[in-house]
Amino acid sequence: MRLLYFSMVLLWVLGASECQVIPSSRRTLRVGIAAAQDTQSGSIGWASCGGTLPIAVQYLKSKGFLTDFDVEYYMEYTECDRASVAKAGMKFMKEMNVDVVVGPSCGDALAIMGTLSAIYKKLVLGWGFVSDTQLADTNRFPYVASVQPTAQTLGLATSRILEMFQFDRVALLYYKDDQDYCKSVMDDVEATLSDPDLYPVRIVWKGELQSDNEALTRSTLQAVKSRARIVLLCAISGPEKRNYLISIAQQNMTTNEYVHILLTMRSIGYGVQTSLGKKTFANGLTPLWESFTVAPDGNETNARRAAEKMLVIDVNSDVQDAEFLQYLTKNIADAVRNPPMKCNTSECINASSTSMGSYARHLFDVFYLYGMAVSKLNSTDPTVYGNLNLLMPQMVTSFDGMTGRVQIGQNLYRVPTYQLYGLDEKYEQVALVNMTFYNSSSQLSRGYSDEGRSVWHFWDGTRPLDTPICGFSGRYCPVQFWDQYGVLIFVASIVLIFLICIMLMCFGFMIRGRRAEQERLNSEWQIPSIQLIMPQKEKRKPNSRRSLQSGPSTITGESKMTIDGGFHENYTVQMFEKDLVLTTKHHSMQMNKEEKEKFVKLRKLEHDNLNKFIGLSIDGPQFVAVWKMCSRGSLQDIIARGNFSMDGFFMFCIITDIAEGMNFLHKSFLHLHGNLRSATCLVNDSWQVKLTDFGLGALLEEHTPSKKRLLWAAPEVLRGSLTIHQMDPSADVYSFAIIASEILTKREAWDISNRKEGADEILYMVKKGGNRTIRPELILDAEVSPRLTTLVKDCWSEQPEDRPKAEQICKLLSEMTPRGNTNLMDHVFNMLEEYTSTLEVDIEERTKELTLEKKKADILLSRMLPKQVAERLKAGQTVEPEGFDTVTVLFSDVVKFTQLAAKCSPFQVVNLLNDLYSNFDTIIEEHGVYKVESIGDGYLCVSGLPTKNGYAHIKQIVDMSLKFMDYCKSFKVPHLPREKVELRIGINSGPCVAGVVGLSMPRYCLFGDTVNTASRMESNGKPSMIHMSEAAHSLLTDHYPHQYETSSRGEVIIKGKGVMETFWVLGKTDSDTKSLSTRTTPPITDENWPPQMKEDLKKRAVTPYPERQRSGKSKMDTLKVV
């Protein structure tokens, strides 16, 4: 909308001269213009700048200025020629009597026009190259006004910047132009920098550059490289600045050693007035590294990287109306060609619509300044708007123009606000320093806090030096230190090493001492987790012969309560340094130095009513706090059991103990307990209450407390969810009152088991508070003092400030002490005399009986089932069948047992088998084999289940079989000493399934063809021989080669299997002598078998066992065969 408005205004301007009828009451401003057509056309040429005047007039009218004025323009092209300027000045001022003269835009020419203005008392508006300091002299040029600052102020700003960065060695470079503008500026800057009253700066090189002479530029830059690292540059046009960036990039002058400072007074900073660039700054200008042609030249990257090493000192360029500046740039060419300018020269006709002259914005601002002053004076008195004595004070003002913030001083020249510009990471120009100069005084303010990150971030954060460390030629590097002082260093090094060794030794001893002291302090409270062990019960291994017997078991340590129970669930009884201790587990956390120092103090905390903190174990998955054992358990447990009678004095002493412990904690470095409950009040052998779980701080905060634990929490803690570090000691007083109510009523907290409200409802009502607060009901005995109950009620007051202090509680309790009863132990002993001989004895005896019976039951169960299976059954879990890839099964049978049994009585048979199998059971335990069952004279064992052992099962079975054979050789039947007991053993290896069968009298049974084949190996074996299948033989020889001697039996017809090759186990090979450590009778092979034996074998393969074998093995076959 704003651009549309200005477009409509411009169209109105272009047609105003032909269509508008001027009323007689309007006044006309006659403006004489001394313009340049060919001189510096890109900067002050009328074709690129003149269009700003009609646009400025309409902009003034849009702001409410010059509304009663028409403007007439009278043009003279003086080209900055002195004679032409003098002629035009005489014409404008003497003949035409204009109101104001605009221009000329060159310094020398403006001096002539200013001289004429002093004679004819006409106002002259200076713009362009008019920064000479002499033009601001009001004595010589009283009627010259300009929005340009003087070059002297630029020199002062440069001096302050060099002083701020401590740069005292610089080079000055400037581009040559037709009017020698940059040379004049650099002369003023050089003169200012040479002022002895200012910061001393040495100018080591001053050179001229030419935009069309690259050779001169290269040679000049090479000369600068050998003399300076801080370069001050003056350039007029954008192409000159860009060419300089490309040149220093080519000469490798864009390293971190160089700082290039562009000096300008055109309020453009890093910008250029063109609309061809791809990027624009916030003020509407195009960055100077962008290409100024329609087709980019490919040097944008190099130019931009060179711009990183450039700073800019310029007049404040913060244009407030960037949108209008873009509008001015695009429409200035049309405005100069159309009425009222009507410039019809070839330059005007061919003027570019994409850019404007460098000083066009200054022409706009200086005429805007004049228009405002005329309007203000006209508003007061329309007849005196041309009176310079009245007009000039109106021009001493400030406004936001197209060149930034403009402030005009008493000399009608601009009071400059210079800024040091730099580039940020996004290549946006930022103001780093603001400098204001007026009447030789200056004010400087930094716009950054970190110089390295703000000013020198393209220099890796380090301010460059104006002189390299090694000089400009690199010949002045310091002499190598070793070359100069080598011998001295060698001698000094020996002495120094010797001294260092002594110092290191001393330092080492000191460090060692400190470390030892630190380790000693840590060892006081840090307990290795390996030193905390659970109290073990001594057990005897059960055997087959005495499967129902159990030896006595003892529990280490002495306690009034059992180790497995009797304490609150948060406590665990463990052994530490042969003493029973109480432990609590906590989440692990990272402890700081303060926490560790607190635990050192905590361990040293001693009081009769505080439980001793022994230490903390921090090397396990959880932290474990270790406390001294209090054998009678917690106060909560004692109250819950309800088997101890407490009279009034006893309850009073318990409450007093708690109060004394709490008071001591409140006066200590801990200041409070923070977790006070009846569960944290332990009772020792002497019936003395000791507070525990204090001082753990952050460890307790890691836990999420249960609802029941919060029953002791104060209302303010519940409402604010306060941590221990945020709690007040009054919260402990509230918890003390709840514990006291438990003691006085002899019931658990809040009598929760008998209340209709649950824990959640009670906590909600406590947290809610109000006039009718909920508290535990005190149903008391007659012997309880009313003063004590009153104290308890005061302690659980709703407001923390209404609760008494712990010290006051102790004082009040001491005043309530009953006379004549001062020793709790005497009182307790008297009270417990009647229970000592009965109650505890009965409890201990029943406990022992229960433990003994449980042990017997466990032993009996372990005899029937594997330990793992028994544990799962005791836990009520279902035992699923489990498959095993490879196991070894053994069947054994007593040869001619029927005949042997016929010679014995039934009791003798039982004793015979018991003696035989008891020793077999011992052999089984030695080899880690599991005995499945024994039925009659049959024996079934397996290895590899229920615990898998790789391939060791074949070795264990074979070794056990050889032991069986050895034992049978020496076994004697007591009542038949001449009879010899022989075994027939069969072995097979393979997969198997095992599981528990039945609910009543459950048995651990084996299923699978592996079991059946092992049975066939036994039934087809020979007396005193170990018969194994080919699968078992392969497993034995593959995994234990050369350890056992075996022999092939050859192919044998096996019932249900057909022809199988089987093997005999002869014995175990001694690896040193290659002899047999155990050897059975040499086998009979198919080659040396008698014909009668072969026939017998065939009959046995197809004929069932005798009746004794079938009847004796019927139950076992049920378990073996699937």
From Swiss-Prot:
One of its GO terms (biological process) is intracellular signal transduction. Its main location: membrane. Residues 1107-1122 have a biased composition (Basic and acidic residues). Gene3D superfamilies: 3.40.50.2300, Nucleotide cyclase (3.30.70.1230), Transferase(Phosphotransferase) domain 1 (1.10.510.10). It catalyses: GTP = 3',5'-cyclic GMP + diphosphate. The protein kinase domain is predicted to be catalytically inactive. This is Receptor-type guanylate cyclase gcy-5. It comes from Caenorhabditis elegans.
